[in-house]
């Protein structure tokens, strides 16, 4: 957080190179610092919407004690973008996904070592970027709404 008299607003920090970034919350530092996230293994991903806005779907009762999430239009776009990951990343197999009103869970298998310089962060970053872009197109076609590229439909921070 910015010090008294600092130009940095609360909730924002300067990184080691002087760039402004959102302050990480305690639950956002779950990556292992020296771990190779390009290696062959199964990864469980959770991505939370900024401000936990419940815009991906709604809980509906299917039967006695049986509930499900019915995706909204935006939730459907996010699911479609997730399921297209393998088009750009043939080294990846999608195992499972679960949409919740304000967050998303996915399990993926990196079947083979990713190309040099690429990691799980690149895969998830491209998914979030594409989702935000596609949701932005959807909102623009409907005559407005917040531009997700500016306000961020998907959280700016990856939670792993």
Regions flagged by a language model, labelled:
Residues 1-160:
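Short catalytic/metal-binding and nucleic-acid-binding patches
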